[in-house]
């Protein structure tokens, strides 16, 4: 598996203008664009801007997933975001923004194993399963109703590569994943402490964040086992807010 290209123990900080404050660990930004525009057209434009090739069947599944989330959300409170326009941008486009970066590390057509920790309603795990059908995706969450939704999506959307794991991440047996990712789970140190055991020796932890969490990085490095390898700025289509990926690898000499 290739790496983002930074030596262990070092990281590259990406400065990015336009931050909008939001909840700790996953700031919500302001979206731009017309809510009246055709969702299919907007989805294809977003994929184009992200350098993603999306087949018609994949676009249909992405929009069906979003529609099902809106439907389930009325009863099961899968997400605090309820406005369809905000869900399109802050959930779907945000999750799509990590597909290409992950593909560059593990390969787009490999049989990579990826865990999505604290997945909630399947973000970004369901999106990854749709866009990369050869990847084996495990969505992990301690809330049963959210995993019931992901399990339903695996069947409704015909995603045999998607599994829903209703459990606390620390209680699952080690999975030997190529990548373990989280979108709104915990601080970097807590994420590494709880989920790092599921990453194979040369694998990668990836945290989706808003602005660069400098304090969290310092705390992580003080613990010594995991180091930030790279900070990659993301530009989410139609979203005026900072987004970044924090890539982490085990420090030299730790297993």
UniProtKB/Swiss-Prot annotation:
GO MF annotations, alphabetized: rRNA (guanine-N7-)-methyltransferase activity
S-S bridge residues: none
Keywords: Cytoplasm, Methyltransferase, rRNA processing, S-adenosyl-L-methionine, Transferase
One Gene Ontology CC term in the entry: cytosol
Main location: cytoplasm
Listed EC numbers: 2.1.1.170
Record: residues binding S-adenosyl-L-methionine: 118, 123, 169-170, 183
Region (Disordered): 1-44
Function statement: Specifically methylates the N7 position of guanine in position 527 of 16S rRNA.
Protein's recorded name: Ribosomal RNA small subunit methyltransferase G
UniProt organism field: Bordetella petrii (strain ATCC BAA-461 / DSM 12804 / CCUG 43448)
Lineage of origin: Bacteria, Pseudomonadati, Pseudomonadota, Betaproteobacteria, Burkholderiales
